[in-house]
Amino acid sequence: MIKEEREFFDVAAKPWRDVPQSKCAGLRERILSGDPATGNYSRILCFDPGTDTTPNGVLTHDFWEEVYIVEGSIVDLRLGREFRAGQYACRPPGMPHGPWKSPGGCTTFEVRYTKD
């Protein structure tokens, strides 16, 4: 199966859900498109104000991940750096990142995909 073909649609019509694999409260996502067979998907990720992802630990993935911060900011607790709206990351498989804290909240647009 591949991602569904979609022309523009109202993103607000997609429901928010808690991030299933997260061990902490305050992370919600809207899946915009996805392919369950490959795990490739695009989503909007929301950190509620005060969210701390320390329970999730440092993350690494076996897929590529691109992240654009739409609004707000997050602090990488491992690096001790704050990243703000307008900044972008491209993470290859295996790149460690997080945990994160977002004192004022943050919204990101993310694309995850395998190399092949």
For each feature predicted by the language model, list its residue ranges.
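Conserved short histidine dyad/triad with adjacent acidic residue
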Residues: 30-61, 80, 92-96
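Short, well-ordered beta-strand segments in beta-rich or mixed alpha/beta enzyme
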Residues: 45-47, 68-74, 107-109
